[in-house]
Amino acid sequence: MGRFIFGSFGLLVLFLSLSGTGADCPSDWSSYDLYCYKVFQQRMNWEDAEQFCRQQHTGSHLLSFHSSEEVDFVVSKTLPILKADFVWIGLTDVWSACRLQWSDGTELKYNAWTAESECIASKTTDNQWWTRSCSRTYPFVCKLEV
């Protein structure tokens, strides 16, 4: 009887230790912290990639980073699959939030920006972020909170 209780307790501990890890991720998604990640090799523009991620699972979006450890995890997943390439991440229209000024200190009032939106792609080898035309096509990573 004691072995049965001890064995049952051991299984309960094992089950609880798996909660919040890969056991909660959809199949073929990878887990890190409380999130699931999936690398998609097909190339899409930023808007289509974000829409594709949203269609995968409720709450899924293009990748966002919140720590250097998370970056290391994502690089470990993307680099072997995509080699030296860019992936779309969930940043776009970064210039709209900036207060720009000229080198002489005056505020930017007149501008001649292109109508093309700028989105951010991360380089798989070193996670450097690059602005790219949102209409370009790249692979991407979807992220899902579990």
Curated annotation (Swiss-Prot):
Q: Where would one find the signal peptide in this protein?
A: 1-23
Q: Which SMART domains match?
A: CLECT
Q: Which GO terms describe its molecular function?
A: toxin activity
Q: List the disulfide bonds.
A: 25-36, 53-142, 119-134
Q: Name one GO cellular component term.
A: extracellular region
**What keywords is this UniProt entry annotated with?**
Disulfide bond, Hemostasis impairing toxin, Platelet aggregation activating toxin, Secreted, Signal, Toxin
The free-text tissue note of the record is: Expressed by the venom gland.
Q: Where in the cell is it found?
A: Secreted
- Taxonomically, the superkingdom here is Eukaryota
Q: Which residues form the C-type lectin domain?
A: 24-143
Location, primary (coarse class): secreted
Q: Which residues fall in a coiled-coil region?
A: none
| Record-linked PROSITE patterns | C_TYPE_LECTIN_2
Biological role stated in the UniProt entry:
Weakly agglutinates platelets at high doses by binding to GPIbalpha (GP1BA).
What is noted besides the main data?
A: Monoclonal antibodies to glycoprotein IIb/IIIa, to bovine vWF, and to bovine serum albumin did not show any effect on the binding of AL-B to platelets.
Family named by the database record: Belongs to the snaclec family.
Question: Quaternary state and partners of this protein?
Answer: Heterodimer of subunits alpha and beta; disulfide-linked.
Q: Output this protein's name.
A: Snaclec alboaggregin-B subunit beta
What is the source species? Answer: Trimeresurus albolabris (White-lipped pit viper)
